A protein has these predicted regions:
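Generic serine detector
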Residues: 5, 16, 87, 108, ...
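Short, small-residue-rich loop/turn micro-motifs
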Residues: 22, 72, 110
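Acidic/histidine-rich alpha-helical segments that form the ligand environment
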Residues: 78-116, 131-136
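Short, charged, low-complexity loops and linkers
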Residues: 1-7, 81-82
């Protein structure tokens, strides 16, 4: 059996860094959509949560509230929300719970094939849970960068 401890170490690192950054964000700041952006910080956080559940566990295994798809799926934006977004505290708690749950559910399955390969057009295809896990870490890092850009734009507009 292959040793995937490095993947779990990276997951711990990435999620830990993300949760630490979340403590610097206020509820007010989380809802600002600066000029030139379509989403806010709260959307990016919810999107990370929803996407990781969906990509690793599929629609049947997701633990996010059902209404999160209408709020945080690709192509959605806060301007279209029909209800108030979850608090940062709630999102942080869900991210912590997800971290534990995914490690428990996939600990010994990273070499297992996904039910169906996940294709990113001509950019590549994920075939295993391990490949998808690594992709979700890239995705989380990408949205961490988006949040940094949003915070910079918010600070510049003050």
């Amino acid at each position: 059996m292959q040793n995937f401890s490095f993947v779990w170490n990276q997951y711990d690192l990435v999620r830990g860094m993300f949760l630490a950054r979340m403590t610097e964000i206020t509820e007010e700041e989380a809802d600002v959509v600066p000029d030139g952006f379509t989403n806010n910080i709260r959307w990016n956080i919810g999107h990370i949560l929803l996407t990781q559940d969906y990509l690793l566990l599929g629609p049947e295994g997701m633990k996010c509230p059902p209404y999160y798809a209408a709020m945080f799926a690709p192509g959605t934006k806060p301007a279209d929300w029909q209800k108030e977004g979850p608090s940062l505290e709630a999102l942080a708690a869900e991210l912590k719970e997800q971290h534990v749950r995914i490690k428990e559910e996939l600990q010994s399955r990273l070499n297992d094939p996904l039910p169906k390969p996940f294709e990113l057009g001509d950019k590549g295809t994920m075939h295993t849970y391990g490949e998808m896990m690594v992709f979700t870490l890239f995705h989380e890092g990408m949205h961490t960068g988006c949040i940094s850009s949003l915070r910079t734009a918010i600070a510049a507009a003050k």
